[in-house]
Amino acid sequence: MNSFLKRVVCATAVAASALALAACGDDEGESSEPTPSSAESTELTPVKLQLQWFTQAQFAGYFAAVDQGFYEDAGLDVEILEGGTDIVPQTQLAQGRADYAIAWVPKALQSREQGAGITDVGQVFQRSGTLQVSFKDKDITTAADLKGKKVGNWGFGNEFELFAGMTKAGIDPGKDVTLVQQQFDMQALLKGDIDAAQAMIYNEYAQVLEAKNPDTGELYKPEDFNRIDWNEEGTAMLQDAIWANTEKLESDKAYQDQTVKFLEASFRGWIYCRDNAEKCRDIVVAKGSKLGASHQLWQMNEINKLIWPSENGIGIVDEAAWDQTVQVAMETKNAEGATVITKAPEGLAYTNDYAEKAVAALEADGVDPNGADFEPIEVQLEAGGA
C-alpha cells in the first residue's frame, strides 16, 4: 500500500503463469491509474528543483524528501540543483532549465513583471528571516535608531525590508543614514566598519555568535547584540516559496498532477525536519554544506521557526502577508529610487489550489501540516560553526 498517494493496489491471480495487478478505486470510489508503487509503474518522473543558494539547512526539507524517499513514493525522481551568486532560480524556471524553483516572493514578482511566467504554488516560509544586527552599545533597537548611523545592506533586492522600515520610521534612506555595501558575511560589523549589519537569522546572525569576543576570549552571546526584526516592525516580506511554470499550470494536466505530488512530498520533508532537526542537520552536512554541523543545526532550528506554526497549513499563502509584501515591493524605493515592482502583480501570481490539495492529502494520512505544537530546540553553536 502506498499511503502517500492514498491508493490500494490489489493483486489477483488470473492464470498459473501470470499475475495481473490492477489499481483499485481511491477513498472516494473512483477508478485511477496504477500508482508508482505498483508493478506496472516502476518508472519515476524526472523533476529538477532549483535552489536559490548553496546546500544548507535553509533547504533541508527538500533534501530530506529525497533522503527519506518521499519523492520516490510520489513517483518522482527529483534532482536538486544547487544555487549560487550567479544563479537566479526563477529565471532558471522560466527558461525551462528547472521544473520548480525556490525564490523569495519580491524577487520573483520582479521577474514576473519582466516577463517570467512563474507562479507561487507553495509558500513554505510564513515569516521573514531578515534582521538588522548591531552591538548593544550602539543602542539601535528600532528602525528610527538607524538615523545618522552607518548601515550595511547587501543590495541586489535584499534591502527593501530595511528601506521600508526606515521610511516608515521617518528616515530618508538617501539622506539620513550612511549606506554601506555589505558583503554576505558579518566581518564589517565585527570590525566596527558599520554600525548595523543585515543578517538572516538562520545564517549571518549565527556567524556573529560563532565569533570570539576579543574582550572575553569566549564566543559572543545574543545579549551582546540588538536585533531589529522586520516582522515586528511591520515591513516584512514573504521569502522562500516554491514556484512553478504558469503556462504548464494552466494547460498541462500531467504537470498539474505532478505539482500536487511534488508539494506533498516536499511538505513531508519539511514536516520530517520539524520533528527531526538533528537528523535533517546530518542530511545537509552529508550533502556537503559549506558551514559545519552546529551552524546547520542552528539554521535548521531557525528555519523551523519561520515555517511553524503554519496556521492554514504548510505552503498556504496568507493573504495579508502577501498583500503586505506586494505593498512594500510597490511603494518602497531603494537608494537609487527604484522599487521592486511598479504595479500590482497580474495574472496567476500565486495560487493555493495545489498546496491545499497536498495539505488535504497529508491530513487524510494523519500527518500534521500545521505544527501548532511545534517547540524549537536549544542549539549550542561552536566556534566557526563547526
PLM region spans:
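Bacterial N-terminal signal peptides that target proteins for export
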Residues: 1-11
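Hydrophobic helical h-region of N-terminal Sec-dependent signal peptides
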Residues: 10-18
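C-terminal motif of bacterial Sec signal peptides marking the signal peptidase cleavage site
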Residues: 19-23
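Bacterial signal peptide processing site
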Residues: 25-28
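Short, glycine-/small- and polar/acidic-enriched structural segments
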Residues: 33-182, 186-191, 195-201, 222, ...
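Pocket-lining segment of extracytoplasmic ligand-binding domains
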Residues: 106, 138, 184-187, 194-290
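Secondary-structure end/capping motifs
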Residues: 252-338
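Conserved C-terminal helix/tail region of periplasmic/extracytoplasmic solute-binding proteins
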Residues: 323-386
